[in-house]
Amino acid sequence: MSKGTSSMGKRQKRTHAKCRRCGSVSFNVHTKQCTSCGFGKTSRIRAYKWQAKCKY
């Protein structure tokens, strides 16, 4: 039940792969969803207003 250095050696599986839609390496293999574009979760491209800087 250790959570330190000895358990870090067991982390060797791939969590994210290359996305089919956006091409970035942010497609979660376990949940089958892309965290960058939202592929697998929604048909629209994932985009938020807070991603762009404000133009003052």
Curated annotation (Swiss-Prot):
Keyword annotations: Metal-binding, Ribonucleoprotein, Ribosomal protein, RNA-binding, rRNA-binding, Zinc, Zinc-finger
PROSITE patterns given in the database record: RIBOSOMAL_L37E
GO biological process, one term: translation
Residues reported in the UniProt entry to bind Zn(2+): C19, C22, C34, C37
Organism superkingdom: Archaea
GO MF annotations in UniProt: rRNA binding; structural constituent of ribosome; zinc ion binding
InterPro entries: Ribosomal_eL37 (IPR001569), Ribosomal_eL37/eL43 (IPR011331), Ribosomal_eL37_CS (IPR018267), Ribosomal_zn-bd (IPR011332)
C4-type ZnF: 19-37
Record's cofactor remark: Binds 1 zinc ion per subunit.
GO cellular component term of the entry, any: cytosolic large ribosomal subunit
Cofactors (names): Zn(2+)
Function per UniProt: Binds to the 23S rRNA.
Family, per entry: Belongs to the eukaryotic ribosomal protein eL37 family.
Protein name: Large ribosomal subunit protein eL37
Organism name: Methanosarcina barkeri (strain Fusaro / DSM 804)
